[in-house]
């Protein structure tokens, strides 16, 4: 396949909006080999491994842990071509990761591959390493059981800090395995808050503010405009760079970062407009559900659908996943996601329905703007709403 067929950086906006990034098209084996190399390099000489979601919340956890362990700072310099970076990290998936000076290693992971990250740390980490898992939650214990056991054999200690919705059986199994698991209230705390209060370390005010502003975006409070800057910068830049920039500057990002964010937001807003323009509203069991498709910033698109009257919103992505956002009127997003291979919070969840068997299914996904994915997620809404109607006592217990 010609490289230009899968490089999306120079695509017209209308096409970029409906196609996934370059990383989607790379073979799993190629990515796995690279991730092995990157993890091995990151763990060389490291005393601590932090497996974290590479969003602003997960990366704030890494910054807090590096501060607590008095890790060396490696502050990046502004690059002349910073603003020329491609659309998102998935368009540059093969960037080599050289050994770093850090004794607290960052191992990025998504909710769908946390078990792979655990296995790599078990394989490449030194005996007696301390392992932290941050801002990630397994849907089922058996998904991580073997890999967690291997990590526990290698590590001196394993701590897991999170704020997502955990099943009681999953949490108990993780604790029974020997993990120090702390799960915060997803309506009150982000994962950075959990790390901040769990570590026996006297953080200065800069890190307290980092946790607070990160929470502002992660819980979608939107009371501090700096939280949008953190979220966008974390999404667009390299995770390692983000961690070191917020360690140096806190939440008041330097001018060169602000300029970079401002330039990237021009395209971000255009992609949001594309997705909002495709939005439809459906009535399901007394609730209005907004649904759309596109590569975009899901929170802003969900907010636009809420303003149009949606009680809940679904943003289906070209890669096959979807974001589900709720409101005070509908707070069962994690239940909907749980029916379609996902999970999350009552008002913010994600999923990737297990409906893609081959590339023809994905081709249909792109050309129909996610029609099948939309249908199965809307069916999940119907099931959740019907279940709630049959068991009103459960709602009363939840509100008590």
Question: Where on the chain are the PLM-derived regions?
Answer:
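Short N-terminal binding/cap micro-motifs at the start of the first secondary-structure element
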Residues: 56-62
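N-terminal small/polar loop signature for handling phosphorylated ligands or for N-terminal nucleophile
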Residues: 23-29, 33-39, 46-49, 74-154
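Short alpha-helices
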Residues: 165-239
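Catalytic PLP-binding core of fold-type I/II PLP enzymes
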Residues: 155-165
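Gly/His-enriched, cation/cofactor- and phosphate-binding structural elements
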Residues: 1-27, 44, 270-400
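Active-site flanking residues adjacent to catalytic metal/cofactor-binding acidic residues
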Residues: 52, 134, 161-162
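Glycine-rich, Lys/Arg-enriched anion-binding loops that position phosphate/diphosphate groups
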Residues: 218-295
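Short glycine-enriched loops at secondary-structure junctions
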Residues: 54-56, 163-167
